[in-house]
Structure formats: structure tokens, C-alpha cells
Amino acid sequence: MFDRRLILLATPRQIGVLDWRPGHMHWLGEFPHSAKGLADFRQMVIEHAGLPMLLVADTVDEDYRSEVLPHVKGRARDELLARKLKQVFRNARFLGAWRQERETTGRRDDRYLLAAFADADWLTPWLSVLHRERVPLSGITPLALACQYLLDKLRVHEPHTLLVFRLSYGLRLSYYQNGLLRFSRLIGGDTPTQLPGNAADDIAKTQLYLTGQRILPREARLHVLLFDPSGQLDSAQAQLNADPRSAHACSI
């Protein structure tokens, strides 16, 4: 069981803070990326001194790669992943590798998801505050990767799931195969969000892309989950469900 911690939801524009403990969540507020926002954030950190924090970042400047690598353990695995990460993401400061599954045939190699923030200089001021205040930072993770645990908690067991978040700064679409992240993209970023009517088109284009890249099997039926407290994606849900050839969509 995890103990109490603060979850930091960071974007290039701001950072939000969630006070989390088992069975309970409390929103502490948002802090804009400005001198005053950083000062207020520092005060909040001081008031919660000693609590571990997890930083969940959401930005268009992210990259994901799926790699199949030899099944090795210990130091050999660490060295293998370090070489592969440096090869794939040459200049990235924040990067990581997550073992997802083991192949069932051949050499039974391991399948990894490699991820990196291509441009994450905007994170530096927030991390500097945490460093100065000696905050125990348990990790930095992309939002799409963190949502693997959300699917598990929601008991979503569909083999092919597209998770669609309507956010104040854009539309996040993430594809999960058997609960594991395979692809994600953020539409909008720092620009104003698109009109809700475009969401169904974006979902359809994403499905075509996944099929074209052979990430999503051509015959697979995509299960779409729409997260939108404002209800602005209702029209997208209706459009998707009206076409029997399309994905099946439902709101949560």
C-alpha cells in the first residue's frame, strides 16, 4: 500500500498539485509558470515538507519507441538499456525504459517501451524548487504512462483501448494494448483547444494511423474511453457509435 504523497501534474504552462492518500484525494491548486507561481509553489512545498512527490508531466514534446531487446538481468540489463536510450534519444535529459512483456516465441526477448521528453527545459524551475527544499521525488513519468494504472483501477480489460482526455490545453489520445501503453499524442498543446466537433475526426485519424503502422491489428475493434467532465465530447461519442465500422466509444 502506498502512503500519502503529493502528485504534481505539470505542463509547460502550469503545475497542479493533488494531495493523495489511499481512498482520498484533495486538490491543492494550480500554479502558473511565472515568478509568482514559482514562489507560491515553493510555499506550498514548504507547508508539506517531508511528503514524497511524484511528478506527472504532459507535453507535446514527448517521444515513445517500442523495442525488443535480449532478455538479460542485473547490471547487464542496466548497461543495455543505457546504451539503447542514448542511441534512440541522443540529447534528451529526461528519459526512461519500462519492461512491458516477454516474447513467447524464439529467444523469448523482452519488449520495452522507451520514452523521453525531447524538450523539457520548462521543468527545470519546478525541479529546482524541489531540489532546494530537499523534497523526496519518487519519479517523473508521462501522463499517458501513468494512466496504465488508471485502466487497471477501472478494471478495463479490453485488448485494444484508446483513452481520450479532454484537457484545458488540448486533447490527449493514448492507445493501450492489453493494458500497456503503445502510443500517445497530445493535440493542441499550448494553443487553444480544438472545437469538440473535431474530436471524432482526430480519433478516427488516430485509429487509421495505428492500423497503418501495424500497431493496431487491422481487424481489431477499438474500445474508446472518453474522459471529459464538461461533456463537450458527447457529439464525438455519438458520431463514433453511429458507424458500425468504427470504434465503440463510451464516456466515464
Place the predicted regions along the sequence by residue.
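Hydrophobic/aromatic-enriched cytosolic interaction surfaces used to assemble or bind macromolecules
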Residues: M1-I252
